[in-house]
Amino acid sequence: MNSIGVYIHIPFCRRKCPYCDFYSINYSAGKADIYTEKVCSSIRYFGESIRRNADTLYFGGGTPGIIGADRLCKMVNEIKENFGFSENPEITVEVNPEKENIDFDKMRKNGINRISIGLQSANDSELKILGRLHNVKQAELCIDRAKSAGFQNISLDLMTSTPTQTKYSLEKSIEFCAKKDVQHISAYILKIEQGTPYYNIRETLDICDEDEQAEMYLFTVEKLKEYGYHQYEISNFCKSGYESKHNLKYWHDEEYIGIGTSAHSFVNGKRFYFPRSFEDFYNLKTVSDGEGGSPEEFIMLALRLSEGLTEKRYKNRFGESIPEVYKNNAAKFSKLGFLEINSDGIRLMPKGFLVSNYIISEILG
């Protein structure tokens, strides 16, 4: 049977950022100990029931790095014992730069081989407005320490169209990432989500309008290309061979198990998730989220990738060519330069990514 990806949600943060709508709570060592034990028992449960090796493991949050290397490595070893790892697994941990005592050496020695650092900006005033707890100097130190521990696969998160950001300051942030010679960069357009502090003060925030957001996004794509980072997904860029294997599972509509509060899963054709509740997670109470793996879902996810919806992948999955109706629906967008249709399939261009939700809904009819 095919390998599976594993996602573990670590919901702890020192302080919640004003733009963030992910599930998180304030960190305490006691809560982290209890949560770690519950994750480990869940790993044992799912390992027994799923019986598939893990080829990717991703610790997301929240702020996974905040709980320390000992707890993280304990969970890695539980996966190793109860799932088993495929050859050369990708094991990622998200960290924030403000925590200066992250034990990268221990992480590396226990099989963790990819670090994702929440930089967001290389401008101290922008970081302060974003409610981040680190400064640029701390971010640089964090990257250097990860490298010194032997990490050769480091990703940085950037945000575009943030309050007071200019094209010049964005260019400097991109330049910072490139000069640090990291392998992967995720660049996200700031979205003001309902229920966040930013949403409550949205009228007072100095942020870009939609046209300016589009300009900043396309500028980001071009600058990263100049520095040798190819775009492989709407918001993700990397040097050759350093695509996030775990995230590609989502976009290739492959199966994964999510463990922890708010974690989603796609296993044996079924989608389900844990609610945003410690009690429900501790009792392994999941909520069904319907069937997964339909042609429509496959197409929607594939079109997020720069390679797009390929004939090869579609045929391997469904045993037939991409239905002509989808190509016909895509034709008008090809004429407008938003996407490309050829014998290999359908793929969006960078300006098409900006309106991808609309284009994909039109293609699917």
Locations of the language-model features?
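Short, amphipathic alpha-helical interaction segments positioned at domain boundaries
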Residues: 351-365
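N-terminal [4Fe-4S]-dependent radical SAM core
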Residues: 1-7, 22, 50-52
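Minor-groove-contacting beta-hairpin "wing" of winged helix-turn-helix DNA-binding domains
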Residues: 345-349
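A short, conserved structural fragment
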Residues: 334-344
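Short amphipathic alpha-helical interaction segments
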Residues: 319-332
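C-terminal scaffold of the Radical SAM
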Residues: 3, 24-46, 55-320
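Alpha/beta-hydrolase
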Residues: 8-10, 119
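Local cysteine-cluster metal-coordination motifs and their immediate loop/turn environment
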Residues: 11-22
